[in-house]
Amino acid sequence: MATEKEIVVSGIRPTGYLHLGNYFGAIRNYIRMQEEFNCYFFVADWHSLTTHPNPKDLQANVMRVLAENIASGLDPEKVTLYAQSHVPEIAELYLLMNMLAYKGELERVPTFKDKVRLQPENVNAGLLTYPVLMSVDILIQRAVKVPVGKDQGQHLEMARNFAQRFNERYGNLFPEPEAFNYGDNLVRILSLDGKGGKMSKSENEMATIYLSDSDEQIRQKLRKAKTDSGGVPGEPMPESVANLIEIMKLVSTPDTVQFYVDAFNAGSIRYGDMKTQLGEDMVKFISPIREKAAALQADPTYLRKIMKEGAEKARVNAAQTLQQARNLIGLNYY
Ligand code: TYM
């Protein structure tokens, strides 16, 4: 029965085009999890408001993220897909949870410190309390597993802290959620420029492969990917090459990967060949997703229907948790 399955929650901010990091850090897990778990996947539109997007861009981005999730293999019949802002219960629990979140701990969050450094002119309260909202997204559905990339690990730790803090003060309500990946470790896909940063929606477009890239863009970006000057037998693999091998493992056959790993170890690797091969395998992987996503975006009526039905389901489960939270806190006067 659906209610007996473990609950899973994850979200993606609609702040730009989805890329390989989003796919391999998160969406790939969603697709497998939909068969085994009771999954709630949402577009984190409130979270994206910290950067004040213009309303038209916001709407286009929300619809695209939804379309790209479905095009990647999420089945709206199996999972609950919704926009965060369509579940107002989240906002109330966020208000309640903010009373248990301390300024000091929020200021110490690495993602907050990064934002303060990158956008000192826009350090708003939403940014500071971002991890509280994210925790509530998860806790309100009483999720136990949260498929995310490595960059979200710290936020998950905070979600566990908030769950514990609430449970200790008011009584047991929230399970403690864990970050989840089918492999051993959480995934971090690096950008192709070899500078060590992660692929991200809004930075360095030439070093990021998007699910919406054309075949030619994919080939071109991979041709330009950073490698090194050539393997020397016995030398450790540079990070930029290791990242390409990791990406190759995701889209190429095991034999192809092994061939290039062996060539690296033997000092005979030809990076041009490797990048051409990876380009072709990547095109095969991305082009069906891109085409399906385009077709879905041409049918906004369908996407709206999915979102609406998803929000209705997500609200039922969220409302139950919220009511229990109100009761435990003592906000039940009649
Ligand atoms: P966001 O929108 O930045 O990213 C969506 C998902 O993609 C993963 N990801 C990556 N994984 C590996 N390598 C990369 N280069 C890479 N870049 C992104 C992210 O880890 C994430 O899983 N705060 C979240 C959104 C959110 C959320 C939630 C997630 C809001 N509420 C509740 C889970 C549960 C974020 O900004 O993700």
Name each region found by the language model.
Residues 12-14, 45-47, 144-145, 203, ...:
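Short, histidine-centered active-site or binding-site loop motifs used for metal coordination
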Residues 2-136, 294:
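N-terminal Rossmann-like or analogous alpha/beta NTP/dinucleotide-binding catalytic cores
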Residues 114-166, 170, 191:
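Internal, conserved structured core segments that host functional sites
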Residues 69, 151, 196:
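Conserved RecA-like P-loop NTPase ATPase core
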Residues 22, 154, 160-334:
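Conserved nucleotide- and phosphate/pyrophosphate-binding catalytic cores
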Residues 103-107, 140-147, 252-260, 290:
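Short helix-capping/linker segments at secondary-structure and domain boundaries
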